[in-house]
Amino acid sequence: MGLSAEEAAEQEDRFDGILLAMAQQHQGGVCELVNTFFSFLRRKTDFFTGGEDGVAEKLITDSFNHHNKLAQKERKEKKARQEAERREKAERAAKLAKEAKQEANEPRIKELTDEEAERLQLEIDQKKEAQKEVNNVPVKSSEDDGDSSDSNKQETDDEEKDENDKGKLKPNAGNGADLPNYRWTQTLSELDLAIPFKVTFRLKGKDVVVDIQRRRLRVGLKGHPPVIDGELFNEVKVEESSWLIEDGKTVTVHLEKINKMEWWNKLVSTDPEINTKKINPENSKLSDLDSETRSMVEKMMYDQRQKSMGLPTSDEQKKQDILKKFMEQHPEMDFSKAKFN
C-alpha cells in the first residue's frame, strides 16, 4: 500500500542532506546534477530498457509536471503574501502620515468642550480625595513593625522607580512618541516613522535623503540640515527596511528590528525617552511571531503587568507554589520563624 499525500510530504525532505551534499559537489549546477541522476539510472538500473517504449519518458514528464505545478503554486502564494505585506505597510504608512499631518495642523493650545472640562475637573477632584484618604491612614502599632518595614522597603523601591521615570514621555497610541518634527510608532518586531515636510511643492525621491544603516538613520531634504541624523536605539535589518513618500509631503520610514523581544524607549540617541512601562502590549501583533518567541514575549508581558501591580512574576509564583506544596507535605515542620526571599 502506497503512502498517503500527507505521509509523502512529511518524508519528502528526508534525503535532503544526501542530495544537498551531492549538489555541492557539482560545480556545473543543476544541469550537471540532473545528468548525474540519469547517468546513474542508465548504468545501474533498467530504467531506460526495462519497460515498454515511452514508459520511462512518461514517468519523467509526469514527475516534472507534478513538481512544476507545486513550484508555481508556492511562487504564487509567496507573491501574494509579499503583496499583502507591502499593502499593509503602505496602509500603515499612509495612516501614520495622516496622523502626523493632523498633528502638525492642530493648534498647540486646544480649547476644551464643556464635557471635557467637566471630566477633567472630576479626575482632579478624585485624585484630591484619594490623596486625603492616604494622608488619613492611621499609623500601625509596634507589633506590625515587621510588616511595616517590608512595606516601607517596597514603597522606597517604588519611589526610586518613579524617580527614574520622571521626565519620560508617555507613549502615544502606537507605543512610540509624537515629537515636534516627526512621529514614530512600534510593535515588538518593527517600527514606523512619519516626517511631514512643510514645503510648497510635491516631494519626489530626488528631493529627499534617506540613509538607513544597521545602527544609524538619516532623513532630510537635499541641501538642508537633516531632520534626523543619529544612532538608532538598536540594530535594524537594513534589507527588510524601506521608505516612501506619502501625499507628496510626508516621508515614511519602515524599520525591521533585529531584536524582536524589546521595546525601544527612543528612536535615536538624541530623542527624549518614553516610559516603556506604560506601553500597551496589545497593540503589538503577537501573531506575527513564531510560537517559541511568542510564548517568551507573553511571559515577559505577564511579568511586566504583575510587577506594575506589585504582584509576583511567573517565576516568583512558581517558587511560592513549590514552597507551599513542600510545607503541606511536611506539616510537622515549623516554618513560622523562617525567612524567605
Swiss-Prot record:
Where are the annotated segments for Disordered?
Answer: 66-181
Q: Which GO terms describe its cellular component?
A: cytoplasm; microtubule; midbody; mitotic spindle
Entry's PROSITE patterns? CS
Entry's family note: Belongs to the nudC family.
Q: Where is this motif: Nuclear localization signal?
A: 73-81
The organism encoding this protein is Gallus gallus (Chicken)
The protein's name: Nuclear migration protein nudC
Q: Where in the cell is it found?
A: Cytoplasm, Cytoskeleton; Cytoplasm, Cytoskeleton, Spindle; Midbody
The protein's role, per its UniProt record: Plays a role in neurogenesis and neuronal migration. Necessary for correct formation of mitotic spindles and chromosome separation during mitosis. Necessary for cytokinesis and cell proliferation.
Gene name, Swiss-Prot/TrEMBL = NUDC
Q: Which Gene3D superfamilies match?
A: 2.60.40.790
